Structure formats: structure tokens, C-alpha cells
Amino acid sequence: AGTTHEPFSWEGKYFHFRYANPWPRPYQQPHPPVWITGTSPDNIPWVADRRYTLATFLTPWDVAEQLFNLYRARCRERGYPEPGPEKFAYLAMVYTGETDERAQEEGKKLLWYLHRRRPVEFFVPPGYVPPAARSRVYKAGPGPLRPRESWEELQAGGLVICGSPRTVLKRARELNERLGVGHFLMMNQAGFMTAQETR
């Protein structure tokens, strides 16, 4: 509907509209930028074919690198222009302290978010992943968001970036050089952190 410039009718499976005329029109044409989060290789061709931005959240760098490379390969395969960094986004949990030592101690509060348990239906709602993958997750039952990796493993994998301002900047540059992302999102609050610790 957002890309149609004239009134139209819609005869869908569940809804029927004899006359639809979206107004006001989106300012950005043909539509605002679309970001798709994904960690499944099955979704990458669909995202790349539409030239949407691919975002990975709390994903190890090696997995994100594989996904971004699949996107780039799909673009080459289809003859699309080489995707620039603006087509890739990455989110990590980031904690910056006055010193590396202090940041390492205070930043461990981020583990609450990474290790907390929650109902599986919130993690994999219907329509987000292929049915076969969803079935595997449901059969496994509720569990932590991620396996209980150690603090050091989470940092080595890139899910957590923690340290002094200089250390965090160095790791952010490493992330950019390795993954070629144009959007680096930082989650810097979780669980029991105080307001001061999140500033």
C-alpha cells in the first residue's frame, strides 16, 4: 500500500477493502528505509533481493560475518550493485567505564540480560522464522537467551564490548573493519544497572 500512488482495492485472505487510499503518503519514496533483523541464512536472499538493511542483534561476529557475506554474495549473483555499509547493522551490549578494570567489574551486570530465562513463545513468535526452525525451538522448551557463555567468551565473540573509552573505541573499529557495518547499535543498559552506570 505504501508504494501505490493511486487508490486500489484489496481482496486478501482475511481482509477485503473495496477502496483503499493511504493518506498522507510516506515522505520517503518509494518507502522509508526498511531494516530486517535476521540470524537465519534462509532469510538472507529475501532481504538482499529487496535491498533492505540486514541487522543482527547479539550475534557472534563470526556468525554475523557469514550472514553479511551471504547478503553480498546474493547481490553479486543477482547483478545488484555491491551493498555499502549502510545495508548492514550490528547490535552489541556495550559498557564503558573509567578504566578497563572498573568496566570489567561493573559491566558484568549485562549478564543478567544475556542469561535470563523467558518463555520460548516470546523468543520465536509465529512468522519470524521458518516453521521447521520454530518447531525445533519449541521442542527444546524455555531456556536462556543464549547458552551460559562466560564473560570472557561473550567479549571474545563480540556480543559484549566492555572497557575504558579507548578499549571500546578500539573494539568498535575492529567490528567495523571485520563486518563492514554502517550502523553500530549499542545496548548499554540491562537488569540491575544503576542510572549512573548507563550514562
Short names for language-model regions:
Residues 34-37, 52-56, 86-93, 175, ...:
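Hydrophobic faces of well-ordered beta-strands that scaffold small-molecule active sites
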Residues 58-61, 186-197:
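Glycine-rich, proline-tolerant flexible connector loops at the mouths of alpha/beta enzymes
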Residues 1-25, 62-181:
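An alpha-helical appendage that flanks or caps ligand/catalytic pockets
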Residues 12-13, 39, 186-189:
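Short, well-ordered beta-to-alpha junction loops that form the rim of enzyme active sites
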Residues 26-33:
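A local structural motif
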Residues 39-63, 67-68, 72:
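A conserved active-site cap/scaffold subdomain adjacent to cofactor or substrate pockets
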Residues 52-53, 153-158, 186-192:
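Glycine- and acidic
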